[in-house]
Design a protein with these regions (language model features):
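Short coil/turn motifs that cap or connect alpha-helices
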Residues: 115, 208-209
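Donor-sugar nucleotide-binding helix/loop cap in glycosyltransferases
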Residues: 202
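Polytopic alpha-helical membrane proteins, predominantly small-molecule transporters/carriers
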Residues: 60, 84-87, 207
Length: 245
């Protein structure tokens, strides 16, 4: 008991521990409890669905109706599986475009002496500061065709703009890629700056070519940052509604 008492006193006396404890309590009250409550309601019958559930169901009875309706009903394909498939496809292609683009830009800014590097390093971040839906509006202003009414800039010049370029997955993927490449740029550039340059110099002294140094020394060291950028990019692109709308 005395050890437990001393442990509690040590935790309470440490301001950092108290901040963590208070944060966990707030997290539990504002997020965990409402989330569990919301999940629990999906297993209880509601007044509006009693007729559909049938079998003499009463309000509050246990039911799997909502999960069956979402996962295995006639509406599941239209309201769940197709949107989920499209979101995953878009997320994967956004990663394929934006992560290599941001990583290459990071390497150019950190490992090369291109002119105007300081200004370019600031300009590279600006697209992420602008909301993604504004890029979608800019895309429409340039590529919109007569299908939606008013012509965009290129259609106004008399150029035929196909629907697949003006709207749809390709337009969404490109707009999101122009927005989310900043994730990989920021993460990879920070990782490159933290790498001890002596490791690359030693590889060069041993006769390794630049591609070999990049492949066997630099890339393994920045791989965690690239994987973090992949996770951030695909999660954000899947959850972004403004561009698609």
């Amino acid at each position: 008991k005395r050890r437990l008492k001393n442990l509690i006193l040590n935790v309470v006396k440490n301001p950092f521990n108290m901040i963590v404890l208070i944060s966990l309590i707030i997290l539990f009250c504002l997020i965990i409890i409402p989330l569990l409550t919301m999940i629990a309601t999906t297993f209880t019958a509601g007044q509006a669905e009693l007729r559909r559930i049938g079998d003499g169901a009463q309000v509050g009875d246990f039911t799997l109706y909502y999960w069956q309706y979402m996962l295995a009903s006639n509406m599941s394909k239209a309201v769940l599986w197709e949107p989920l498939r499209n979101s995953l496809i878009i997320g994967v292609f956004v990663v394929i475009i934006s992560v290599p683009l941001g990583s290459v830009l990071a390497w150019l800014m950190v490992r090369t002496d291109i002119p105007g590097k300081k200004i370019l390093s600031m300009l590279v971040i600006i697209p992420y500061m602008i909301p993604s839906w504004t890029k979608a509006l800019s895309w429409l202003a340039v590529f919109r065709n007569s299908t939606s009414g008013a012509n965009g800039f290129l259609a106004g010049l008399g150029l035929p703009i196909p629907d697949w370029l003006a709207y749809g997955p390709i337009a969404i993927i490109l707009c999101m890629s122009m927005h989310y490449y900043a994730f990989s740029y920021i993460m990879v550039s920070g990782s490159l700056r933290s790498i001890n340059s002596e490791l690359e110099e030693m590889g060069e002294i041993q006769g390794a070519s630049k591609p070999q140094i990049l492949r066997y020394i630099t890339l393994p060291l920045i791989l965690p940052s690239i994987l973090s950028a992949v996770i951030m990019t695909i999660s954000k692109s899947i959850g972004t509604y403004g561009v698609a709308a």
